[in-house]
Amino acid sequence: MSVSSIADKIVSESILIVDFGSQVTQLIARRVREAGVYSEIVPFNRAEEAFQRLQPKGIILSGSPASVVAEGSPRAPESFFQAGIPIFGICYGQQVMCHQLGGKVTANDVDGEFGRAFIDVIAPSPLFENLWKVGEKHQVWMSHADRVEALPEGFKPIAVSDGAPFALIADEKRRFYGMQFHPEVVHTPDGGKLIAHFVHDICGLAGDWTMAEFRQTKIAEIRKQVGDGRVICGLSGGVDSSVTAVLVHEAIGDQLTCVFVDHGLMRQGEAEQVVSLFREHYGIKLVHVNAEDRFLAGLKGVTDPETKRKFIGKTFIEIFEEEAKKIGGADFLAQGTLYPDVIESVSFLGGPSVTIKSHHNVGGLPERMNMKLVEPLRELFKDEVRDLGRELGMPDVFVDRHPFPGPGLAIRIPGEVTKERCDILRKADAVYLEEIRNAGLYNAIWQAFAVLLPVRTVGVMGDGRTYDSVCALRAVTSTDGMTAEIYPFQPEFLANVATRIVNEVRGINRVTYDFTSKPPGTIEWE
């Protein structure tokens, strides 16, 4: 199959997800992708345009904080119901479908269903063939006040709950399905399978969307967009920019130049790893700027976390712009923008409006230098970027790397940042991560790091008194970084790490562990 044919195949074998403003719409896309089918999320007021572009094989209508019976609440394009393709309505999506097709929805401010609920399957359906059987009871997750009171013509109930007589409905002839619960959340145990049944059995999609196909498609798109032009890419050493650089280089070779601004605030050995991988292993043209002195000079005397962040971000952009001008002739800027950065969100306060989340890793640089953006990862979620990195043959040490903040160690050193304190923290952090890897725990943890506190305590080493710094250890589990739980290390593990740090890292004589979840705390200390 040719590259252009692969691109056409991905677009034609897709699911369109219409967003009515639900907080969990992204999870719908995740479940469809997990079923091996490409999906796109669009706000309801741009859905018709997206439908014409994608020509999807099925439509999913999301939930919403709005009420179908409220004046001005969002609607699906009427043309969707005449298109002859399957539709899957979730919560508000079910209600709006029923309302637009002649059913009745009532507002309910008293006794809605919220949280775990159970549905009883009362009729068979191709939607859950070989998954659920008539007479069975299944756990789902509800979050609704309004509910459907009367079904449109052609629909019948196929599952009920205590608070929803039409918990799951079907018009099998038109292949329209609606459910009052949320199959996209993990609290509906069979929800992912239900969505997979919809895209495979109802929409007839094979589920063969793979990273290998995505890779070839993106290579073709990059070559078409860039032509004979030149591209620069800012490398941070993180997963997103690294995968972007390798993919773009595979597409256009020496037309790409990467700029790696080393601010002296990276983890131990990280700068050397970046240079080695990209310059020596991949043969990518790389400009390595050692700007440690410039950053540390600007941070002298600075203790406020926000001031640190702003200075580091501003200085990074200045240096990147200086280097880009030295390179000269660049027509494009490659960025590691991801799908959550560009999904359009919908607000209903004061009427429907669309806010597009912007994501510029180098601020306004593209506009100031008259460059066009190349964003090959903009359709991917974070874990899919890691999958693409593996598909590209990148080393696990880069692909599976824990998130690392742009300001680096500066926000893991509360108080003034100095070279001496950076060096102390680097060593402690390296010991901690080494022990985590040795225990086989690295990939079970979302993020782990050490923090060097601006606190000194008395200790005893040998026969002498010490008065040195305190190191705090942090490790959390998370799926998206929005919320996080502490990682439950065994006490023996933490005791071993603490012993190694105080013995091997001069300048630290006490180690603590941070037991704070997010919320109320943040993952980073500053």
From Swiss-Prot:
Superkingdom in the source lineage: Bacteria
Name of the featured protein: GMP synthase [glutamine-hydrolyzing]
Keywords assigned by UniProt, alphabetized: ATP-binding, Glutamine amidotransferase, GMP biosynthesis, Ligase, Nucleotide-binding, Purine biosynthesis
Keyword Amino-acid biosynthesis applies: no
Catalytic activity: XMP + L-glutamine + ATP + H2O = GMP + L-glutamate + AMP + diphosphate + 2 H(+)
Gene3D superfamilies from the UniProt entry: 3.30.300.10, 3.40.50.880, HUPs
CDD domains listed in its UniProt record: GATase1_GMP_Synthase, GMP_synthase_C
Chain's gene name: guaA
Pathway: Purine metabolism; GMP biosynthesis; GMP from XMP (L-Gln route): step 1/1
Active site per database record: C91 (nucleophile), H182, E184
Glutamine amidotransferase type-1 domain location: 14-208
Family annotation (InterPro entries): Class_I_gatase-like (IPR029062), GATASE (IPR017926), GMP_synth_C (IPR001674), GMP_synth_GATase (IPR004739), GMP_synthase (IPR022955), GMPS_ATP_PPase_dom (IPR025777), NAD/GMP_synthase (IPR022310), Rossmann-like_a/b/a_fold (IPR014729)
